[in-house]
């Protein structure tokens, strides 16, 4: 339990930041799912546009350390590989 005023304030700030970070992580997951959904539908153009949007979200989240930068790089790499494979198979 926070006893000092400073500790109480930090607890309030952490709660607020936790909620914001959770929404940012959710946005990352939603963006990735949108790409995977368009890949399953074999829609190359939709996957490309969703990928460009997801890259922005991933880079912002990684820059703010909401997700690890290596995880963002890994996701971008794997998703671009899947899009490339879809484009080459069509």
From Swiss-Prot:
Keywords: Ribonucleoprotein, Ribosomal protein, RNA-binding, rRNA-binding. This is Small ribosomal subunit protein bS20. The keyword Ribonucleoprotein applies. The gene is rpsT. One of its GO terms (molecular function) is small ribosomal subunit rRNA binding. Belongs to the bacterial ribosomal protein bS20 family. PANTHER family: 30S RIBOSOMAL PROTEIN S20, SMALL RIBOSOMAL SUBUNIT PROTEIN BS20C. Binds directly to 16S ribosomal RNA.
């Amino acid at each position: 339990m926070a006893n000092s005023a400073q500790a109480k304030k930090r607890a309030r700030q952490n709660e607020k930041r936790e909620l914001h970070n959770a929404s940012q992580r959710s946005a990352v997951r939603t963006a990735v799912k949108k790409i995977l959904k368009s890949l399953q539908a074999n829609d190359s153009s939709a996957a490309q546009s969703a990928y460009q949007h997801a890259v922005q979200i991933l880079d912002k989240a990684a820059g703010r350390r909401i997700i690890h930068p290596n995880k963002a790089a890994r996701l971008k790499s794997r998703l671009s590989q899947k899009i490339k494979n879809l484009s080459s198979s069509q």
